[in-house]
A protein has these predicted regions:
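Juxta-kinase regulatory segment immediately upstream of eukaryotic protein kinase catalytic domains
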Residues: 1-20, 209, 213
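ATP-binding glycine-rich loop module of kinase domains
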Residues: 19-61, 68
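Active-site beta-strand termini and strand-to-loop segments that position acidic
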Residues: 32-37, 91-92, 141
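Conserved structural core of kinase catalytic domains
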Residues: 56, 68-113
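AlphaC helix (C-helix) of the protein kinase catalytic domain N-lobe
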Residues: 63, 67-70, 119, 180
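Short C-lobe core helix of eukaryotic-like protein kinase catalytic domains
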Residues: 114-124
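Catalytic-loop of the protein kinase fold
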Residues: 124-140
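C-lobe/activation-segment region of protein kinase-like
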Residues: 141-216
Length: 216
């Protein structure tokens, strides 16, 4: 099935028994949709609040752009495009969030090595996620393979990007790597290996937050 036909079929199934709501938040809604024998994840912008509606739609469009840059990168769900209503259609990852798997994965060097390679590969393509500390933004499939999801606030750096955007990208890049350290070492920063210290450089905001608000 071509993407155009797929997007049309999925759009028609939203709101029917073939569409199962799995999450709803201020920013968006997630649906699991089955069509043509396959299961897809559909992300819709939450338009219930008029003042959040344009922001949420921008987030979906930004995420669509990011998935285009990361196309064919192993560990990134496939993106099939946007429906006519602006819904984002993605590959459905049959697994659990890192939040649900964190204790099972404690000490699993293979998983964290794979996750680090994925993050670095993402950065090399000019994408910084910026919110990987949030455990729900990491998915783990049945083979314990990591996936990165939810790129709504990610930033894309192009060669023509200006100084400010490149500076923001560098900060978010550090934040992504610091998030990897946080998940691998469970906030035990004094136990970071000498090799992994190369990936750890807390930002001023993170230092302030950890010292005066809570341990990140």
């Amino acid at each position: 099935m071509e993407n155009r036909d797929l997007l049309k079929a999925i759009s028609e199934k939203l709101g029917t028994p073939s569409s199962v709501p799995i999450f709803e938040g201020n920013q968006g809604k997630l649906f699991k949709v089955k069509t043509d024998g396959n299961i897809y994840l559909v992300k819709s912008a939450n338009a219930s609040n008029w003042w959040l509606k344009p922001i949420n739609r921008w987030s979906i469009e930004n995420e669509h752009k990011v998935y285009g840059v990361l196309r064919n990168l192993d560990g990134i769900p496939k993106c099939y495009g946007l429906t006519n209503n602006g819904d984002l259609v993605l590959e459905y990852i049959d697994g659990k969030s890192y939040r649900d798997m964190q204790f099972e994965l404690d000490g699993n060097d293979h998983f964290f090595d794979s996750l680090l390679k994925l993050i670095i590969a993402m950065h090399n393509k000019g994408i910084a996620h910026g919110d990987l500390k949030r455990k729900d933004n990491l998915m783990v499939d049945k083979d314990l393979k990591p996936y990165l999801v939810d790129f709504g606030t990610a930033i894309v750096k192009y060669d023509r990007s200006g100084f400010i955007k490149k500076m923001v990208f560098d900060v978010l890049k550090k934040t992504d790597l610091n998030a990897w350290i946080k998940h691998k070492y469970k906030r035990s920063y004094d136990k970071i290996s000498s090799e992994d210290l190369n990936y750890y450089s807390p930002t001023s905001i993170e230092k302030f937050y950890r010292k005066f608000i809570k341990r990140i």
